A protein has these predicted regions:
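Alpha-helix-loop-beta-strand connector modules within alpha/beta enzyme cores
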Residues: 124-126, 134-137, 142-146, 150, ...
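Glycine-rich beta-to-alpha transition loops that act as phosphate-gripper elements at the mouths
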Residues: 78-81, 218-220, 290-296, 367-381
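Glycine/Thr-rich beta-alpha phosphate-binding loop at enzyme active sites
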Residues: 44-57, 252-265, 307-367
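Active-site glycine- and acidic-residue-rich loops that bind
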Residues: 222-234, 262, 288-307
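N-terminal capping/small domains of soluble enzymes
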Residues: 1-151, 212
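C-terminal helical cap(s) of enzyme catalytic domains, especially alpha/beta-barrels
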Residues: 110-123, 325-340, 401-424
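Glycine-rich phosphate-binding active-site loops on the catalytic face of alpha/beta enzymes
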Residues: 99-105, 313-321, 384-410
Length: 436
Protein backbone atom coordinates (compact mmCIF):
# COMPACT_ATOMS: atom_id res chain seq x y z
CA UNK A 1 0.00 0.00 0.00
CA UNK A 2 1.49 3.36 -1.07
CA UNK A 3 1.77 6.42 1.12
CA UNK A 4 -1.15 8.15 -0.62
CA UNK A 5 -3.55 5.25 0.03
CA UNK A 6 -2.37 4.63 3.56
CA UNK A 7 -1.94 8.19 4.82
CA UNK A 8 -2.74 11.12 2.58
CA UNK A 9 -6.03 10.01 1.01
CA UNK A 10 -7.75 9.12 4.30
CA UNK A 11 -6.85 12.56 5.63
CA UNK A 12 -8.22 14.26 2.53
CA UNK A 13 -11.41 12.23 2.49
CA UNK A 14 -12.10 12.61 6.21
CA UNK A 15 -11.60 16.36 5.86
CA UNK A 16 -13.93 16.93 2.93
CA UNK A 17 -16.54 18.56 5.17
CA UNK A 18 -14.06 21.01 6.65
CA UNK A 19 -13.10 24.38 5.25
CA UNK A 20 -11.07 23.54 2.10
CA UNK A 21 -8.54 26.20 3.05
CA UNK A 22 -7.95 24.55 6.42
CA UNK A 23 -7.28 21.24 4.69
CA UNK A 24 -5.06 22.97 2.15
CA UNK A 25 -2.97 24.52 4.92
CA UNK A 26 -2.58 21.19 6.72
CA UNK A 27 -1.40 19.52 3.51
CA UNK A 28 0.97 22.39 2.77
CA UNK A 29 2.31 22.19 6.32
CA UNK A 30 3.24 18.54 5.79
CA UNK A 31 4.88 19.29 2.45
CA UNK A 32 6.73 22.21 4.03
CA UNK A 33 8.17 19.92 6.69
CA UNK A 34 9.31 17.47 4.02
CA UNK A 35 10.86 20.29 2.00
CA UNK A 36 12.80 21.56 5.02
CA UNK A 37 13.86 18.20 6.46
CA UNK A 38 15.21 16.26 3.50
CA UNK A 39 18.54 15.85 5.30
CA UNK A 40 16.95 14.00 8.20
CA UNK A 41 16.74 10.22 8.08
CA UNK A 42 12.95 10.25 7.97
CA UNK A 43 12.76 13.11 5.50
CA UNK A 44 15.31 11.45 3.21
CA UNK A 45 13.39 8.18 3.28
CA UNK A 46 10.00 9.80 2.63
CA UNK A 47 11.47 11.86 -0.19
CA UNK A 48 12.76 8.70 -1.84
CA UNK A 49 9.38 7.01 -1.49
CA UNK A 50 7.64 9.97 -3.10
CA UNK A 51 10.04 9.94 -6.04
CA UNK A 52 9.61 6.22 -6.57
CA UNK A 53 5.82 6.50 -6.71
CA UNK A 54 5.18 9.82 -8.41
CA UNK A 55 8.14 10.65 -10.68
CA UNK A 56 8.40 9.68 -14.33
CA UNK A 57 11.60 10.64 -16.13
CA UNK A 58 11.86 10.31 -19.88
CA UNK A 59 14.10 12.20 -22.28
CA UNK A 60 11.18 12.64 -24.68
CA UNK A 61 9.44 14.86 -22.14
CA UNK A 62 12.39 17.21 -21.64
CA UNK A 63 12.55 20.71 -23.09
CA UNK A 64 14.82 23.71 -22.80
CA UNK A 65 13.09 27.09 -22.78
CA UNK A 66 14.83 30.40 -22.04
CA UNK A 67 18.00 28.46 -21.28
CA UNK A 68 16.19 26.54 -18.53
CA UNK A 69 15.87 22.75 -18.67
CA UNK A 70 12.41 21.41 -17.85
CA UNK A 71 12.48 17.64 -17.13
CA UNK A 72 8.83 17.38 -18.14
CA UNK A 73 6.15 19.85 -19.28
CA UNK A 74 3.76 19.47 -16.33
CA UNK A 75 4.11 22.03 -13.55
CA UNK A 76 2.34 23.17 -10.42
CA UNK A 77 0.35 26.35 -11.01
CA UNK A 78 0.66 29.42 -8.81
CA UNK A 79 -1.66 29.61 -5.84
CA UNK A 80 -0.90 26.38 -4.04
CA UNK A 81 2.45 27.36 -2.52
CA UNK A 82 2.10 31.11 -2.11
CA UNK A 83 5.10 31.57 0.17
CA UNK A 84 7.42 28.94 -1.28
CA UNK A 85 7.34 26.90 1.92
CA UNK A 86 7.35 23.59 0.00
CA UNK A 87 9.58 24.70 -2.88
CA UNK A 88 12.07 21.89 -2.32
CA UNK A 89 9.59 19.00 -2.52
CA UNK A 90 7.58 19.59 -5.70
CA UNK A 91 10.10 17.76 -7.88
CA UNK A 92 9.66 14.66 -5.72
CA UNK A 93 5.93 14.70 -6.51
CA UNK A 94 6.67 14.40 -10.21
CA UNK A 95 6.28 17.99 -11.33
CA UNK A 96 8.61 19.28 -14.03
CA UNK A 97 8.54 22.77 -12.53
CA UNK A 98 6.65 24.72 -9.87
CA UNK A 99 5.36 28.27 -9.81
CA UNK A 100 5.36 29.92 -6.39
CA UNK A 101 3.14 32.79 -5.30
CA UNK A 102 1.30 34.90 -6.00
CA UNK A 103 3.63 37.00 -3.83
CA UNK A 104 3.29 40.73 -3.21
CA UNK A 105 5.87 43.22 -1.99
CA UNK A 106 3.92 43.87 1.21
CA UNK A 107 2.68 40.87 3.15
CA UNK A 108 -1.10 40.81 3.40
CA UNK A 109 -3.84 38.62 4.92
CA UNK A 110 -6.04 38.47 1.83
CA UNK A 111 -9.81 38.54 1.81
CA UNK A 112 -12.03 37.43 4.72
CA UNK A 113 -12.86 33.74 5.13
CA UNK A 114 -14.49 31.65 3.86
CA UNK A 115 -12.80 32.36 0.55
CA UNK A 116 -12.22 28.94 -1.03
CA UNK A 117 -15.02 26.62 -2.11
CA UNK A 118 -15.23 23.30 -3.91
CA UNK A 119 -17.80 22.99 -6.69
CA UNK A 120 -17.72 19.20 -6.81
CA UNK A 121 -20.51 18.83 -9.34
CA UNK A 122 -18.48 20.94 -11.76
CA UNK A 123 -15.04 19.54 -10.85
CA UNK A 124 -14.15 23.13 -10.09
CA UNK A 125 -13.21 25.54 -7.34
CA UNK A 126 -14.21 29.10 -6.54
CA UNK A 127 -11.63 31.22 -4.79
CA UNK A 128 -11.38 34.81 -3.69
CA UNK A 129 -8.18 34.47 -1.68
CA UNK A 130 -6.93 37.98 -2.42
CA UNK A 131 -3.19 37.30 -2.69
CA UNK A 132 -2.77 36.25 0.95
CA UNK A 133 0.98 35.85 1.48
CA UNK A 134 3.85 36.82 3.78
CA UNK A 135 5.48 39.16 1.30
CA UNK A 136 8.48 39.15 -1.03
CA UNK A 137 11.05 39.57 1.75
CA UNK A 138 9.85 36.42 3.53
CA UNK A 139 9.85 34.40 0.31
CA UNK A 140 13.34 35.64 -0.55
CA UNK A 141 14.66 34.52 2.84
CA UNK A 142 13.20 31.05 2.42
CA UNK A 143 14.48 30.60 -1.12
CA UNK A 144 17.91 31.89 -0.13
CA UNK A 145 18.12 29.09 2.42
CA UNK A 146 17.12 26.52 -0.17
CA UNK A 147 19.65 28.01 -2.56
CA UNK A 148 22.39 27.43 0.01
CA UNK A 149 21.39 23.77 0.18
CA UNK A 150 20.91 23.36 -3.55
CA UNK A 151 23.14 20.87 -5.30
CA UNK A 152 25.56 22.78 -7.50
CA UNK A 153 26.00 20.64 -10.59
CA UNK A 154 26.45 22.72 -13.74
CA UNK A 155 25.72 21.36 -16.24
CA UNK A 156 23.35 18.81 -14.66
CA UNK A 157 25.03 15.45 -14.10
CA UNK A 158 23.84 12.94 -16.67
CA UNK A 159 23.00 9.47 -15.50
CA UNK A 160 21.44 6.56 -17.32
CA UNK A 161 17.75 6.09 -16.68
CA UNK A 162 18.05 2.61 -15.27
CA UNK A 163 15.48 0.88 -13.16
CA UNK A 164 16.93 0.66 -9.68
CA UNK A 165 16.62 -3.03 -8.92
CA UNK A 166 19.16 -5.12 -7.01
CA UNK A 167 21.70 -6.30 -7.80
CA UNK A 168 22.99 -3.02 -9.20
CA UNK A 169 26.50 -1.64 -8.99
CA UNK A 170 26.49 1.97 -8.01
CA UNK A 171 28.84 4.85 -7.61
CA UNK A 172 28.69 6.76 -4.36
CA UNK A 173 28.27 10.52 -4.64
CA UNK A 174 28.71 12.59 -1.50
CA UNK A 175 25.94 15.18 -1.47
CA UNK A 176 25.85 17.69 1.39
CA UNK A 177 26.52 14.97 3.93
CA UNK A 178 24.18 12.43 2.35
CA UNK A 179 25.28 9.58 0.13
CA UNK A 180 23.12 9.03 -2.93
CA UNK A 181 23.21 5.98 -5.15
CA UNK A 182 23.79 6.62 -8.83
CA UNK A 183 23.70 3.94 -11.55
CA UNK A 184 27.08 3.31 -13.17
CA UNK A 185 27.39 4.56 -16.73
CA UNK A 186 27.32 1.91 -19.42
CA UNK A 187 30.65 1.00 -20.94
CA UNK A 188 31.57 3.20 -23.86
CA UNK A 189 30.02 1.91 -27.05
CA UNK A 190 27.58 -0.39 -25.27
CA UNK A 191 24.06 0.14 -26.57
CA UNK A 192 21.24 0.78 -24.10
CA UNK A 193 18.25 -1.49 -24.10
CA UNK A 194 15.01 -0.28 -25.62
CA UNK A 195 13.55 0.15 -22.17
CA UNK A 196 16.50 2.29 -21.08
CA UNK A 197 16.50 4.25 -24.31
CA UNK A 198 12.84 5.14 -23.97
CA UNK A 199 13.35 5.90 -20.30
CA UNK A 200 9.99 4.55 -19.24
CA UNK A 201 11.18 3.69 -15.78
CA UNK A 202 12.02 6.23 -13.16
CA UNK A 203 15.54 6.79 -11.93
CA UNK A 204 16.84 8.22 -8.72
CA UNK A 205 17.24 11.95 -9.37
CA UNK A 206 20.27 13.50 -7.72
CA UNK A 207 18.31 15.18 -4.99
CA UNK A 208 19.62 16.63 -1.79
CA UNK A 209 18.12 19.53 0.08
CA UNK A 210 17.00 22.39 -2.06
CA UNK A 211 15.55 22.89 -5.50
CA UNK A 212 15.64 20.18 -8.12
CA UNK A 213 13.27 21.56 -10.76
CA UNK A 214 12.84 25.02 -12.31
CA UNK A 215 11.05 27.49 -10.06
CA UNK A 216 8.81 30.26 -11.33
CA UNK A 217 7.72 33.17 -9.14
CA UNK A 218 4.34 34.80 -9.69
CA UNK A 219 4.28 38.50 -8.78
CA UNK A 220 1.16 40.44 -7.80
CA UNK A 221 0.33 43.97 -6.70
CA UNK A 222 0.01 44.67 -2.98
CA UNK A 223 -3.53 45.66 -2.07
CA UNK A 224 -2.30 48.73 -0.15
CA UNK A 225 -0.45 50.01 -3.21
CA UNK A 226 -2.48 52.41 -5.38
CA UNK A 227 -2.92 51.36 -8.99
CA UNK A 228 -0.90 54.41 -10.06
CA UNK A 229 2.10 53.02 -8.14
CA UNK A 230 1.72 49.42 -9.33
CA UNK A 231 4.87 49.46 -11.45
CA UNK A 232 7.07 50.32 -8.46
CA UNK A 233 5.37 47.62 -6.39
CA UNK A 234 6.07 44.89 -8.94
CA UNK A 235 9.60 46.18 -9.44
CA UNK A 236 10.33 46.07 -5.70
CA UNK A 237 9.23 42.44 -5.45
CA UNK A 238 11.22 41.50 -8.53
CA UNK A 239 14.31 43.21 -7.16
CA UNK A 240 14.19 41.06 -4.03
CA UNK A 241 13.56 37.79 -5.85
CA UNK A 242 15.18 38.07 -9.27
CA UNK A 243 18.16 35.83 -8.48
CA UNK A 244 15.99 33.19 -6.81
CA UNK A 245 13.62 32.22 -9.61
CA UNK A 246 14.13 30.66 -13.03
CA UNK A 247 11.30 32.68 -14.55
CA UNK A 248 8.88 35.37 -13.36
CA UNK A 249 5.21 36.03 -13.98
CA UNK A 250 3.40 39.35 -13.91
CA UNK A 251 -0.06 38.56 -12.54
CA UNK A 252 -2.46 41.29 -13.64
CA UNK A 253 -5.40 38.95 -14.20
CA UNK A 254 -6.63 37.82 -10.79
CA UNK A 255 -10.24 38.90 -10.19
CA UNK A 256 -9.70 39.04 -6.42
CA UNK A 257 -7.71 42.27 -6.04
CA UNK A 258 -9.74 45.44 -6.71
CA UNK A 259 -8.78 47.03 -10.00
CA UNK A 260 -6.02 44.53 -10.79
CA UNK A 261 -7.46 43.40 -14.10
CA UNK A 262 -7.42 46.99 -15.32
CA UNK A 263 -3.63 46.62 -15.40
CA UNK A 264 -4.06 44.33 -18.41
CA UNK A 265 -4.75 47.49 -20.38
CA UNK A 266 -1.79 48.05 -22.72
CA UNK A 267 -0.98 51.49 -21.32
CA UNK A 268 -1.00 50.35 -17.71
CA UNK A 269 0.84 47.11 -18.38
CA UNK A 270 3.55 48.84 -20.40
CA UNK A 271 4.54 50.86 -17.31
CA UNK A 272 4.95 47.66 -15.29
CA UNK A 273 6.91 45.84 -17.97
CA UNK A 274 9.18 48.80 -18.55
CA UNK A 275 9.97 48.99 -14.82
CA UNK A 276 10.68 45.26 -14.60
CA UNK A 277 12.92 45.17 -17.65
CA UNK A 278 14.93 48.09 -16.26
CA UNK A 279 15.48 45.99 -13.13
CA UNK A 280 16.12 42.81 -15.11
CA UNK A 281 19.92 42.96 -15.23
CA UNK A 282 20.13 39.15 -15.16
CA UNK A 283 17.83 38.84 -18.17
CA UNK A 284 15.42 36.56 -16.36
CA UNK A 285 12.46 35.32 -18.43
CA UNK A 286 9.39 37.45 -17.68
CA UNK A 287 5.90 36.29 -18.65
CA UNK A 288 2.44 37.77 -18.25
CA UNK A 289 -0.53 35.77 -16.99
CA UNK A 290 -3.76 36.78 -18.68
CA UNK A 291 -7.45 36.33 -17.94
CA UNK A 292 -9.65 34.01 -20.00
CA UNK A 293 -12.35 36.66 -20.16
CA UNK A 294 -10.44 39.08 -22.40
CA UNK A 295 -11.75 39.83 -25.88
CA UNK A 296 -9.63 38.67 -28.80
CA UNK A 297 -8.57 42.19 -29.72
CA UNK A 298 -7.39 42.82 -26.15
CA UNK A 299 -5.29 39.65 -26.26
CA UNK A 300 -3.83 40.75 -29.60
CA UNK A 301 -2.85 44.09 -28.02
CA UNK A 302 -1.09 42.24 -25.21
CA UNK A 303 0.81 40.14 -27.72
CA UNK A 304 2.10 43.29 -29.40
CA UNK A 305 3.18 44.55 -26.00
CA UNK A 306 4.95 41.25 -25.35
CA UNK A 307 7.00 41.77 -28.48
CA UNK A 308 7.78 45.40 -27.64
CA UNK A 309 9.10 44.57 -24.17
CA UNK A 310 10.75 41.28 -25.03
CA UNK A 311 8.52 39.10 -22.90
CA UNK A 312 9.53 35.46 -22.67
CA UNK A 313 5.99 34.13 -22.95
CA UNK A 314 2.35 34.14 -21.89
CA UNK A 315 0.52 32.10 -19.27
CA UNK A 316 -2.99 31.31 -20.46
CA UNK A 317 -5.09 31.50 -18.42
CA UNK A 318 -6.05 32.68 -14.96
CA UNK A 319 -9.46 31.97 -13.40
CA UNK A 320 -12.72 33.12 -14.98
CA UNK A 321 -15.45 35.31 -13.54
CA UNK A 322 -18.08 33.64 -15.73
CA UNK A 323 -20.76 31.56 -14.02
CA UNK A 324 -22.96 30.57 -16.97
CA UNK A 325 -21.35 27.16 -17.51
CA UNK A 326 -21.71 25.97 -13.92
CA UNK A 327 -24.02 23.21 -12.75
CA UNK A 328 -23.61 24.33 -9.14
CA UNK A 329 -26.35 26.79 -8.25
CA UNK A 330 -25.67 27.50 -4.58
CA UNK A 331 -22.60 27.50 -2.31
CA UNK A 332 -23.46 25.28 0.65
CA UNK A 333 -20.98 26.94 3.01
CA UNK A 334 -22.59 30.37 2.60
CA UNK A 335 -26.09 29.52 1.42
CA UNK A 336 -25.78 32.07 -1.38
CA UNK A 337 -26.31 31.51 -5.12
CA UNK A 338 -23.01 30.98 -6.91
CA UNK A 339 -23.81 33.99 -9.10
CA UNK A 340 -23.67 36.20 -6.00
CA UNK A 341 -20.33 34.89 -4.77
CA UNK A 342 -17.26 36.91 -5.74
CA UNK A 343 -14.15 35.15 -6.96
CA UNK A 344 -12.63 33.26 -9.84
CA UNK A 345 -13.60 29.82 -11.11
CA UNK A 346 -10.91 27.25 -11.85
CA UNK A 347 -11.11 23.65 -12.96
CA UNK A 348 -13.09 21.83 -15.64
CA UNK A 349 -15.37 24.74 -16.68
CA UNK A 350 -12.27 26.67 -17.74
CA UNK A 351 -10.81 23.95 -19.96
CA UNK A 352 -12.21 24.88 -23.36
CA UNK A 353 -11.80 28.63 -23.07
CA UNK A 354 -8.19 28.41 -21.91
CA UNK A 355 -7.42 26.05 -24.79
CA UNK A 356 -9.04 28.46 -27.25
CA UNK A 357 -6.90 31.30 -25.90
CA UNK A 358 -3.76 29.18 -26.22
CA UNK A 359 -4.60 28.34 -29.83
CA UNK A 360 -5.29 32.01 -30.62
CA UNK A 361 -1.92 33.09 -29.17
CA UNK A 362 -0.07 30.36 -31.05
CA UNK A 363 -1.67 31.32 -34.34
CA UNK A 364 -1.23 35.07 -33.82
CA UNK A 365 2.47 34.67 -33.01
CA UNK A 366 3.07 31.78 -35.43
CA UNK A 367 4.42 29.77 -32.54
CA UNK A 368 7.24 32.18 -31.74
CA UNK A 369 6.08 33.05 -28.20
CA UNK A 370 6.19 30.22 -25.64
CA UNK A 371 2.91 29.56 -23.83
CA UNK A 372 2.28 27.97 -20.45
CA UNK A 373 -1.22 26.52 -20.60
CA UNK A 374 -3.36 26.19 -17.50
CA UNK A 375 -7.04 25.65 -16.88
CA UNK A 376 -9.12 22.48 -16.51
CA UNK A 377 -6.40 19.84 -16.89
CA UNK A 378 -7.45 16.57 -15.27
CA UNK A 379 -6.34 13.90 -17.74
CA UNK A 380 -3.71 13.16 -20.36
CA UNK A 381 -6.31 14.06 -22.99
CA UNK A 382 -6.72 17.50 -21.43
CA UNK A 383 -2.95 17.96 -21.33
CA UNK A 384 -2.51 16.84 -24.93
CA UNK A 385 -5.26 19.21 -26.05
CA UNK A 386 -3.39 22.18 -24.64
CA UNK A 387 0.02 21.06 -25.87
CA UNK A 388 -1.17 20.53 -29.43
CA UNK A 389 -3.00 23.86 -29.27
CA UNK A 390 0.35 25.54 -28.65
CA UNK A 391 1.38 25.22 -25.00
CA UNK A 392 5.04 24.30 -24.51
CA UNK A 393 4.41 23.82 -20.79
CA UNK A 394 1.23 23.15 -18.83
CA UNK A 395 0.18 23.59 -15.21
CA UNK A 396 -2.32 22.00 -12.84
CA UNK A 397 -3.82 22.92 -9.50
CA UNK A 398 -7.55 22.20 -9.19
CA UNK A 399 -7.26 18.91 -11.10
CA UNK A 400 -4.45 17.82 -8.78
CA UNK A 401 -6.65 18.56 -5.77
CA UNK A 402 -9.47 16.44 -7.19
CA UNK A 403 -7.42 13.56 -8.60
CA UNK A 404 -4.60 13.34 -6.08
CA UNK A 405 -0.82 13.09 -6.41
CA UNK A 406 -0.88 10.11 -8.79
CA UNK A 407 -2.34 12.40 -11.46
CA UNK A 408 1.01 13.88 -12.50
CA UNK A 409 2.55 10.52 -13.36
CA UNK A 410 -0.65 9.32 -15.03
CA UNK A 411 -0.78 12.39 -17.26
CA UNK A 412 2.87 12.05 -18.23
CA UNK A 413 2.38 8.37 -19.05
CA UNK A 414 -0.60 9.29 -21.21
CA UNK A 415 1.35 12.00 -23.02
CA UNK A 416 4.14 9.52 -23.77
CA UNK A 417 1.58 7.15 -25.25
CA UNK A 418 0.31 9.97 -27.47
CA UNK A 419 3.85 10.64 -28.68
CA UNK A 420 4.37 6.97 -29.47
CA UNK A 421 1.06 6.67 -31.31
CA UNK A 422 1.99 9.60 -33.54
CA UNK A 423 5.60 8.61 -34.07
CA UNK A 424 6.93 11.70 -32.32
CA UNK A 425 10.32 11.56 -30.62
CA UNK A 426 9.91 14.53 -28.27
CA UNK A 427 7.27 16.69 -26.66
CA UNK A 428 8.47 19.71 -28.61
CA UNK A 429 7.22 18.06 -31.82
CA UNK A 430 3.70 18.01 -30.40
CA UNK A 431 3.58 21.67 -29.38
CA UNK A 432 1.17 23.48 -31.69
CA UNK A 433 0.73 20.45 -33.94
CA UNK A 434 -3.04 20.84 -33.76
CA UNK A 435 -3.08 24.58 -34.45
CA UNK A 436 -1.64 24.65 -37.94
Amino acid sequence: MDIYQSTIRPILFSGLKTDPEWLHNRTLGLLSWLSSNQKSTLGHWVNGQLQQRFCLNDARLEQTLWGVNFPNPLGLAAGFDKNGVAAGIWGSLGFGFAELGTVTFHGQPGNPRPRLFRLVEDKAALNRMGFNNLGATAMAARLEQLKVNRLQVQPPLKVNRLQLQPPLKVNRLQVTGLEKNLPEEKAKGEQPTGRERQGRTTFNRIQASGLTIPIGINLGKSKVTPLAEAADDYRSSFGLLRELGDYFVVNVSSPNTPGLRSLQDATQLSLILDALQQENVSQKPILVKIAPDLEWNAIADLLELAQTYGLAGIIATNTTIRRDLLKTQRIAATGKPVTEEAGGISGAPLRQRSTDVIRFIWQETQGTLPIIGVGGIFTAEDAWEKITAGASLIQVYTGWIYNGPWMVRQILQGVLQKLEQRGMSSISEAVGSGSG
